[in-house]
């Protein structure tokens, strides 16, 4: 395994090393904004594995203009010391609206509960940067997961990359990442 900034890349494993062993005896899910070019490339590699190779949402790459925008924050999700997840967030305008997208966790690690920490980290971080609301396009099988995290549906499902997605929204004023209670 190759260590990057104190954690481990899942893409440079030797056949004899177990990733779960590398994660540590009692791994915890943690998230952080990428700190350098190597971490950003790892973030992009995880997205490539999930959105291009596994889900086939994109033909060759899921990269777009947001990846080159200096306001975009690329986040890595760690399971113990192993980088296995991502999320990307960026401001949509000056009104405080942010977008979260490219939430991805490598298949073998989805059972470890990293999706929730990644989403909560994105919500909290956008709020810390002055955001008031975050929107996201969610694949329909994941809508209930986002609702459990306090997100609300907005409008009807619409196709994105030839697959139905539901636009969802969450308020960022509550530091817990939960939408304010109605009324």
Regions found by a protein language model. Give the residues of each.
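Low-acidity, Ser/Thr- and Arg-rich intrinsically disordered low-complexity segments
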Residues: 2-5, 9-12
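Short amphipathic alpha-helix that is part of the acyltransferase structural core
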Residues: 10-82, 174-183
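A conserved beta-turn-beta hairpin within the catalytic core of GNAT-like acetyltransferases
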Residues: 91-101, 110, 160-165
């Amino acid at each position: 395994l190759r260590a990057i900034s104190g954690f481990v890349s899942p893409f440079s494993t030797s056949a004899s090393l177990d990733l779960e062993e590398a994660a540590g005896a009692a791994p915890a899910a943690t998230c952080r904004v990428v700190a350098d070019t190597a971490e950003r490339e790892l973030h992009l590699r995880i997205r490539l594995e999930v959105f291009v190779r596994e889900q086939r949402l994109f033909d060759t790459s899921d990269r777009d203009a947001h990846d080159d925008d200096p306001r975009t924050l690329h986040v890595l999700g760690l399971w113990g010391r192993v980088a296995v997840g991502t999320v990307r967030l960026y401001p949509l305008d000056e009104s405080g609206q942010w977008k979260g997208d490219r939430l991805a966790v490598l298949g073998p690690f989805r059972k470890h509960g990293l999706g929730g920490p990644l989403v909560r980290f994105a919500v909290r971080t956008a709020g810390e940067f002055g955001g008031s609301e975050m929107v996201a396009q969610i694949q329909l099988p994941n809508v209930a997961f986002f609702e459990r995290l306090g997100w609300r549906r907005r409008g009807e499902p619409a196709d994105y990359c030839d697959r139905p997605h539901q636009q969802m929204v969450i308020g960022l004023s509550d530091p817990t990442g939960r939408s304010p209670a109605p009324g």
